[in-house]
């Protein structure tokens, strides 16, 4: 009875300790060198040292700033989708350029942003803006277009103003899809920031991934991966 009641809590709680035990046993039984795969305790010790020295906080802060800046601006730009949904001419004007940019691999655009804006957070934030704005824009267009004409006709019969129609109809209809777009955009924002940092940066968790790869520091790579997963 107890197990059935708390099964959803017990199983996830047991997975991590079991995973760490299997990890440690694998290293000991097969004598895996620590430069290929360090043990859990050794990796945790290196993580603690990074936090104690304060070095890692700089990289976390830079990555978070890039994600936050790019996401906020990307959301604002994504709201252009409302204008595109209301004015067909604007959609026909903007959408082809948006699609062309989005079909291009983001990793191929990162060097351009770095060349134009330098190695600072601006180039990485620009890449985040690019990946964030598209899903929000598309979801906003789809949401507004999904509102039936009968709903608008009813508001006209009630002599509602455009502002009232916007607040009472368009916002409630579009909020769910917009939040869905933001949720998708947040996962892509992390990817955009890390890609930019890996290609060219002075700091950031993506920069640590590249630095760890170049210096064959597996602990640095794994610590960066863990922190990115937590963030």
Where are these regions (language model features)?
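Transmembrane-helix boundary motif in ABC transporter permease subunits
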Residues: 69-98
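Short helix-to-coil transition segments within interhelical loops
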Residues: 144-147, 154-174, 214
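Transmembrane alpha-helices
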Residues: 126, 130, 163-196, 227-228
């Amino acid at each position: 009875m107890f197990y059935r009641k708390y099964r959803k809590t017990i199983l996830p709680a047991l997975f991590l300790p079991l995973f760490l035990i299997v990890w440690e046993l694998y290293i000991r039984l097969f004598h895996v060198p620590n430069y290929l795969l360090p043990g859990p305790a050794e990796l945790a010790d290196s993580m603690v040292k990074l936090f104690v020295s304060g070095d890692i906080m700089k990289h976390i802060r830079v990555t978070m700033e890039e994600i936050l800046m790019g996401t906020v601006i990307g959301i604002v730009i994504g709201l252009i989708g409302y204008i595109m949904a209301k004015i067909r001419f604007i959609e026909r004007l903007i959408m082809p350029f948006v699609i062309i940019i989005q079909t291009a691999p983001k990793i191929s655009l990162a060097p351009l942003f770095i060349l134009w804006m330098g190695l600072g957070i601006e180039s990485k934030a620009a890449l985040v803006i690019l990946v964030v704005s598209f899903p929000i824009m598309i979801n906003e267009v789809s949401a507004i277009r999904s509102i039936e004409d009968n709903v608008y006709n009813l508001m006209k019969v009630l002599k509602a103003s455009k502002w009232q129609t916007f607040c009472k109809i368009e916002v409630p209809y579009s909020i769910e899809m917009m939040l869905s777009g933001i949720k998708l955009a947040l996962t892509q924002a992390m990817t955009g920031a890390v890609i930019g940092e890996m290609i060219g940066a002075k700091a950031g968790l993506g920069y640590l991934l590249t630095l760890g790869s170049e210096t064959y520091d597996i602990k640095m790579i794994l610590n960066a991966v863990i922190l990115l997963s937590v963030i």
